[in-house]
Amino acid sequence: EVELVIRLGENLLPESMCVGCDTTNRTHQGLAKENGWPWTEGKSFRGSAVLGTWTDWNEDIKEISLSVNDELRQNAKTSLMVHDIKSLLFHLNRWYELSPGDYIWTGTPKGVGPLKIGDRVYATMSDVDGIIVSKLDAICIN
């Protein structure tokens, strides 16, 4: 799943951003669900989160997209996010001790789906002019 990822600066405000892909091991997640265990093994494993190229923070990011093997799977405007960045950071800061350098993954649009070993994953983040400001190009290995 594709997400806008923010890196916090000294004042706990967005400093930079990139596109990211967050993956889930559905077998481990399902086992955890069945047994009432935490989802840690399904969400936190080597290669589970891949980051694209970093760029300076800009509130005018308008779109994130994800293709798998050249097939578009996710494409959404950031204006459709459930929570805007300011509200998200306010909420997180109330519950967690945020620090400069922390990464905030902001959530994913509809269209998540399975990957297979060898799948090519390509994700982008574009500005208001449609210019790609962050991208990642990866091959699924797990």
Predicted regions and their residues:
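Catalytic-core "active-site belt" of small-molecule-metabolizing enzymes
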Residues: 1-103, 111-142
